[in-house]
Regions:
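Conserved alpha/beta-domain cores
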Residues: 1-200, 206-208
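Gly/Pro- and small hydrophobic-enriched strand-loop and loop-to-helix capping segments
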Residues: 210-224
Length: 224
């Protein structure tokens, strides 16, 4: 597994698809290291990656401790309220804010303002977590009461399908909703970012203006 080579190939694809979508800025690549060892995560760091994503408490703590201090740590998975206190002040971004109970606990435990993505279930699948697209505005309005939460953007996970036009339509819907929220000029919810696209569909997300793509197996492989 050559992480440097993988990153170069991913960046080439991102550049190609950003040009195709008339997007001037390439998305940040988050190395999703939940299935790999600390050594492999270090390979990603040495290849130039600075954004790392974990979705399990144990893995997050191990990687956070082992990697250099200049990394940007993203917690990208669903977070149980009882585990908020162990995570929230150790991360730079939280990608899965999807319920008020969680927002309340984050606000209570946070020692500073936390950069959060509201997770949106754009596809409407029962198996997917997230706020329904039609409920995003109302959900974000209710977050105004929580002084330690800053809604920096929206996040979604597309379904596993070969139908690229369908996936693109979902990413377009998220982008449109982001633009709608951004236009409201809310101090607590600037909503300038988009977290979307994984190993199978990051190229489509790039075309639609993703700010962050979350790439695991295609970048660092899978060891566990």
């Amino acid at each position: 597994m050559n992480v440097q080579y993988n990153l170069e190939q991913i960046e080439k694809q991102l550049k190609t698809h950003c040009e195709k979508g008339n997007i001037s800025t390439l998305p940040n690549v988050i190395a999703v290291t939940k299935y790999v060892t600390i050594d492999r995560a270090n390979d990603a760091y040495n290849a130039g990656i600075r954004h790392f994503g974990e979705n399990r408490l144990e893995g997050f703590q191990l990687k956070k401790e082992a990697l250099p201090d200049d990394i940007v740590m993203h917690f990208i998975g669903s977070l149980q309220t009882r585990k908020v206190k162990e995570v929230i002040n150790e991360i730079d971004y939280f990608h899965a804010l999807d319920r008020l109970k969680l927002a309340k606990e984050i606000n209570k435990r946070a020692e500073h303002k936390i950069k959060c993505f509201v997770q949106v279930n754009v596809s409407g699948e029962d198996s997917k977590q997230g706020v329904a697209l039609k409920d995003v505005n109302t959900f974000i309005e209710t977050l105004e009461q929580y002084e330690n939460i800053e809604v920096v953007g929206l996040m979604t996970m597309a379904p596993l399908t070969d139908d690229e036009s369908y996936i693109k339509s979902l990413f377009q819907s998220l982008k449109n909703k982001r633009d709608e929220i951004k236009a409201l000029n809310l101090n607590y919810a600037p909503c300038t970012e988009l977290s979307m696209g994984m190993s199978n569909d990051f190229h489509l997300a790039a075309e639609e203006g993703a700010s962050f793509v979350r790439i695991g197996t295609k970048l660092v492989g899978k060891e566990e």
